[in-house]
Amino acid sequence: MSWTEFELLNQKEREEFTRCCAYIMARTYVPRDTPNMTISKEYSFIQSKFPLFDEYLALSGWRIYLDRTLAVIYVRNIEGFNKLRLDKLTTLIIITMRLIFEEKRMDGGTLNAGLITVGELLTKMINEFSLLPKKPNNRELKDSLRILEQHNIIYKMSDNYDDMECKIKILPSIAVAIPNDRCRTVYEKLRAEEEENSDENNDEGSID
């Protein structure tokens, strides 16, 4: 790697480079738009120094990508290490959000149209997509949503996930995290599992 470009950075730019490296490694995804619909300073800086980030991260086995269509920058480990393992509830939530995001895009919405409330999310999961038999407890729900928030899959637009009216913005990074074909495959598998569990519970509760 040539450090010529890095050496040309002033002290403030070097500090910002270090900060942005730590940020994207912790968050995985860097959407262009902030919750206030301004341009993210991390996105702007990484984009402006993209070749430098690309070379630097490659040294430790990472690739950085810039998806201009979705307006998101993200990283992947070359060997497939450091993948985030999601529990069952978080997986159900992110699949539901991915389906909602795609629905809104198909309806002609913009990349920033994926705004829902916690209550609407749960209604979709329970009634429409049949992925949950009932509302999960608040602690598990909040933990799952916080994981997605930490990785810039969603933005929390209101104060508290406990509130069913709390607004959540589904970010375009969800389309990178879960491609459409994979989403459908996982959804069908999860729904089949839920239907099987429901049938087993009904059998256990029946009297011949």
Where are the regions a protein language model picked out?
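Short acidic, hydrophobic short linear motifs in intrinsically disordered regions
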Residues: 31-40, 110-126
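A short, conserved structural fragment
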Residues: 59-66, 145, 149-160
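Short basic alpha-helical hairpin corresponding to helix-turn-helix/winged-helix-like nucleic-acid-binding
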Residues: 54-114
